């Protein structure tokens, strides 16, 4: 029901009781006085007094009552609007937003567990995914492709400029030499080469290259000699010789080729670290990347391809992005529930945030409440308050009428005690 209608109905009820009390009082004035008539008259009188007193109290809150002397104590809410705003802001600051109250609230409710329980529900995780997809969809519709492409290109170029290519390469190689991991890499390479040379296709390829070399460099001998037979047997000899060498390197941890590989690796690391020529080559590679048309065209097309893929995925019923977000949210919730230390850490961070933020935030909110109330029109504010709590205030008038009538009855009965029980009879 509309608040205005409820307020008017409550006012009519309170006024009706006042009019009934007044009418009853007037009627008793014209009736012959007796015990009952005088009693009804006393009840009506007291009811009118209670109704009028509470009417004045309620009306004085919102409007000025033009009664000499006491009129300056009426229209309490409009007159004290600014003070009400300041006191309301101060009340909220002291009772709800002080640091200790917020910390106690965090400790009492353990928000990390509440968050975990909420996210662990698949329906809630999917809801988060759906909302994020809507935000993402709106972002994709509003973005300027040309600007995004330029931004992406500048970001990649800046990242390339910041990379110390020679230093990073040296660091990576140096990390590979720890615990002889580079020798493990060499072992893997040797094993792959041995397996490759043992294949028939590899031997046929070597034989073909030998035959081609003979035909190219020694065409006369190639016509006289059985080139195919020579190629096949030479391929076998080459493969067996290389396999034997690789097998020796693989078995002998102190093989001279391993030492040569060590020296070459450490020499390359030293060059990457200290050789200006190597640094210049690295810078040249970076410049080439930034100026290469194919690379820059790829960067420009990357955003468009990503944007189209996202739009198609977002609009599909079985969106993979939505599913991933939902899974991530559910995993986050389940992790919070299962990990006591993580929850304690998160709650601790929230408490620290409350200590840092609460004073400034509460002061800001206090000023905001006070300034907002001060900016309101006094009469409009009074009407809004009356509209929201006026119905209950009208029942104060109703209760004043009823309580006044009851008090009038009690006082009348007390006044009749001497007549009912004369002292001379005792």
Curated annotation (Swiss-Prot):
UniProt keywords, alphabetically: Cell membrane, Membrane, Transmembrane, Transmembrane helix
Membrane topology note: Multi-pass membrane protein
Transmembrane region(s): 13-33, 42-62, 403-423
Primary residence: membrane
GO cellular component term, pick one: plasma membrane
KW Transmembrane helix (keyword) present: yes
Record InterPro entries: DUF445 (IPR007383)
Record's subcellular location: Cell membrane
Pfam families: DUF445 (PF04286)
Superkingdom of the organism of origin: Bacteria
Keyword RNA-binding: no
Database matches in PANTHER family: INNER MEMBRANE PROTEIN, INNER MEMBRANE PROTEIN-RELATED
Protein name: Uncharacterized protein YjiN
Organism, as annotated: Escherichia coli (strain K12)
Lineage of the organism: Bacteria, Pseudomonadati, Pseudomonadota, Gammaproteobacteria, Enterobacterales
